[in-house]
C-alpha cells in the first residue's frame, strides 16, 4: 500500500464511479466539482450484460461519456465482469479501488489485501474532509464497519460487525419460529409482539453498539494519543435511521464511499 498525502487530484470533466455492494450497486457520474448524479440497481444485474450495457449507455447519453472510471467493489465476481464491460463500452481503463493505490492516509494493516474497497474509499474521503483531525469513519450497511485515522493520517485500526439486515435475517434463518422482520425505528424500547420485540432488539441493540463503540474509540484516542477533538463521519444505507440515536456526528453522507472512490480515481490517474 502507498501513502501520498500531498498528491494532487487530477481534473477530469466526466468521471464514472461504480460502487458494487452485496445487495445493490450505485452508479455515480461526477462532472467537475458538482454534486454527482446517482442511480442504483440491484447488484444481481451484473449477470445480465445487455441490461447493464443499456444502463451505462443511458447514463452516458445523459451526462456524456466518462473519461475516467473507477470500480469500488466488495463482490470479487462482479468486479472483473463490471471492469470488462465498462472498458468495452467506453474504451477507458478502469481503476479498481484496492490496497495498491496511492492514498491520502497511511494504511498500516496486517492483511491489506483483505481491506475492503469501500473502507479504503471511506477512509480517503474522511481524511480529505478532516485533514488535520482524528476521525472515526462508520459505514452502516450490510456489515457495520468502523475505521480510525489519527491527526497525521495514520490508520489506527477498526472493527467489523453484522449489519441490521444481517442480524434480523440470522434470527429468522437460524430459528424455527422467528419471522423475517423489516427493521425500522420502533415506537418504543420494549415490544409487545414477537415482531416488535425483534425490531426493538435489533434496532436498539445496533444503536447502543455503535454509540458505545464510538464513545470507546473516542476515549482511546484522547487517552492514548492525546487527541482532543475527534470527528465522526457516518455513511451507509441504514445510517439515516441510526444516526439520530447515537449522539454527536460531524458528517452524515450516504455518498461518502462514492466521493472517496472519485478522489482516489483522480489521485491515481497517470
From Swiss-Prot:
Positions bound to ATP: 19-26, 142
Top-level class of the enzyme under EC nomenclature: transferase
Binding site for substrate: 109, 116-119, 194
One example of a Gene Ontology biological process annotation: coenzyme A biosynthetic process
Binding site for K(+): 139
Cofactor field: NH4(+); K(+)
Pathway of action: Cofactor biosynthesis; coenzyme A biosynthesis; CoA from (R)-pantothenate: step 1/5
Catalytic activity: (R)-pantothenate + ATP = (R)-4'-phosphopantothenate + ADP + H(+)
Cofactor binding mode and count: A monovalent cation. Ammonium or potassium.
UniProt cross-references to Pfam families, sorted A to Z: Pan_kinase
GO molecular function: ATP binding; metal ion binding; pantothenate kinase activity
Keyword Nucleotide-binding annotated: yes
Keywords: ATP-binding, Coenzyme A biosynthesis, Cytoplasm, Kinase, Metal-binding, Nucleotide-binding, Potassium, Transferase
GO cellular component, one term: cytoplasm
Subcellular location: Cytoplasm
InterPro entries according to UniProt: ATPase_NBD, Type_III_PanK
Entry-linked Gene3D superfamilies: 3.30.420.40
Subunit structure: Homodimer.
UniProt cross-references to NCBIfam families, sorted A to Z: baf, PRK13320.1-4
Role played: Catalyzes the phosphorylation of pantothenate (Pan), the first step in CoA biosynthesis.
Family: Belongs to the type III pantothenate kinase family.
The name this protein goes by in its record: Type III pantothenate kinase
Organism listed in the record: Chlorobaculum tepidum (strain ATCC 49652 / DSM 12025 / NBRC 103806 / TLS)
Name of the gene this protein is made from: coaX
Amino acid at each position: 500500500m502507498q501513502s501520498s498525502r500531498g498528491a494532487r487530484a487530477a481534473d477530469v470533466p466526466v468521471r464514472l464511479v461504480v460502487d458494487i455492494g452485496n445487495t445493490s450497486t450505485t452508479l455515480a457520474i461526477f462532472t467537475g466539482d458538482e454534486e454527482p448524479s446517482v442511480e442504483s440497481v440491484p447488484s444481481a444485474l451484473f449477470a445480465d450484460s445487455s441490461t447493464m450495457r443499456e444502463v451505462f449507455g443511458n447514463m452516458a447519453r445523459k451526462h456524456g461519456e466518462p473519461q475516467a472510471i473507477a470500480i469500488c467493489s466488495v463482490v470479487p465476481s462482479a468486479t472483473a465482469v463490471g471492469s470488462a464491460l465498462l472498458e468495452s463500452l467506453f474504451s477507458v481503463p478502469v481503476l479498481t479501488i484496492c490496497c495498491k493505490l496511492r492514498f491520502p492516509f497511511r494504511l498500516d494493516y496486517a492483511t491489506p489485501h483483505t481491506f475492503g474497497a469501500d473502507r479504503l474509499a471511506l477512509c480517503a474521503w474522511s481524511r480529505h474532509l478532516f485533514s488535520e483531525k482524528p476521525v472515526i469513519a462508520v459505514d452502516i450497511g450490510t456489515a457495520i464497519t468502523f475505521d480510525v485515522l489519527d491527526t497525521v493520517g495514520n490508520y489506527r485500526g477498526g472493527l467489523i460487525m453484522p449489519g441490521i439486515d444481517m442480524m434480523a435475517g440470522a434470527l429468522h434463518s437460524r430459528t424455527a419460529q422467528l419471522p423475517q422482520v423489516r427493521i425500522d425505528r420502533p415506537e418504543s424500547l420494549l415490544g409487545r409482539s414477537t415482531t416488535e420485540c425483534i425490531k426493538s432488539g435489533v434496532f436498539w441493540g445496533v444503536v447502543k453498539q455503535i454509540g458505545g463503540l464510538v464513545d470507546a474509540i473516542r476515549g482511546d484516542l484522547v487517552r492514548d494519543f492525546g487527541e482532543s477533538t475527534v470527528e465522526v463521519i457516518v455513511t451507509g444505507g441504514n445510517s439515516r435511521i441510526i444516526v439520530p440515536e447515537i449522539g454527536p456526528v460531524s458528517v452524515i453522507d450516504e455518498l461518502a464511499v462514492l466521493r472517496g472512490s472519485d478522489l482516489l480515481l483522480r489521485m491515481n490517474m497517470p
